[in-house]
Amino acid sequence: MAIQKGDFIKLSYTGRFEDGRVFDTTDEELAKTEEIFNPRGLYGGDVVIVGAGHTIDGLDEDLEGKEVGYTGTVVISPEKAFGPSNPKLVETVSITKLQDRNVHPGLPVEIDGKRGVVSRVIGRRVTVDFNSPLAGKTVNYEYTIEKLLETETEKIQGLLALYTGIREIEIETADGVAKIYIPTGLTFNQRWLMAKNRVATELFKYADFKEIQLIEKITAESEAQELAELTAEAEAEESSEPEI
């Protein structure tokens, strides 16, 4: 069955620049080899909803009409990747604004809270590009559609993993109602606080739920773990305080 908008799929991919450099991948070993490994990242494939904006436009569009098991490569222009480079974000400043005076093209810098990369040095003047490193780049994605998710539980857990980085969260579903038991540690997680409304909205739109219940689950075990973590943090802070 061909993939269409609204489908929940598991997707493995590797994104490369035109020169072959990898900037993103779901392959943990490749990420380590290319020195882009993120210890907080979730590897092994992402669950995305086709057409929901979970990937860049060019990749999202290419998924439609493919079959589960499909492996291929798509070349994506900046307009449908990470956007064109904005010339207004390229500024020329005095070298005195930089802490590091050993300035050269390619040097990452931060000026007035903005991060950029030095693109040119002429005398005492430095041109800094504050665009995203991905802006204006043609990229290619090599990807595999591993699975079409069909059960309610798979869809919810996949979406939660995408937004929280946690694969296993307890879920119950019945009669159009989803009960999601939120672990204590996630309750005050900034990433989760910003994402939970979007999770609910997408489950209403793409999975036909009529009610989402977010239930904070506290157990003796989780409380003990939380206490142990807080105690360890407090001891670490104490040990780092200078003696008077």
Give the predicted meaning of each segment.
Residues 1-244:
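FKBP-type peptidyl-prolyl cis-trans isomerases
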